[in-house]
Amino acid sequence: MQRFLVVNDMKIIFATGNSGKLREASEILDEGFELVTPAQVGITEDIPETGKTLRANSLQKAQYLFERCGCDCFADDTGLEIDALGGEPGVHTARYAGEDKDFNRNMDKVLYELSVLESSGKMAQEYGLQTRPASRKARFKSVITLIFKGETHLFEGTLEGEISRAKSGNGGFGYDPIFIPDEYPGKTLADITEEQKNEISHRGKALRAMAKWLKENA
C-alpha cells in the first residue's frame, strides 16, 4: 500500500479538481502539509458523488480515492442551505441549475427563486392575506472525510449568513458573490479578502479541525 506520510512534511491527496477549493485548502493548511491532486497520482476520471447527504458524498469520494490508490486522502462536500427554499440547494449545490456545474447559472436560479417568493408574498399582502417575508437566511456546511492509515474520520464546519439581492465582488468562487456572512454585514464572500474569508469559512473550519487532528495523531 502506497502512503504519502513523511515525518513532518505531510503529503495528502485532496479529492478535488476544483482549483478554487485547492487554492483555499493550500492557504489554510500550513507549511506542514503538501496537497496532492488525484490527477497527480494518475486518477483522472470523475470521482462519483451520488449520496443523498453531504456526509454520504464526502465519504463516497474519499473511499473511492482510497480504494484506487491506497493513500492517505480526504474529500469534502459542501452545501448551501437556504431557509426560504426548504434547505435547497443542499446536496445539489454544485448542480443546482444543471449538470454542467455552472455557478453563474446556479446563482441566477437562487436569486430568481427568492425574488419569486418575495413577489408572491407582496401580492398576497395586497389581497389582505397574512404572510411572512421570505427569509434570506442561509448557511454553508462543509463535511470533510479523512482516511488516514486506513481509518475514517469526519470533520465539519458551518458558516451562517444570508443571500444578497444581487451578485457582488470579484473574489472567491462558487456562490461567494451572493453570500453575505454574518461576520461582514453588507459584504459578500466575494467582496472580502481571501485571508478574511479563510478565517471564517465553513471549509476553513473543517480543514483546521482536520489539520489539528493530524498533528496530534500522525
PLM features: what roles do these ranges have?
Residues 7-13, 20-218:
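Anionic-ligand binding patches
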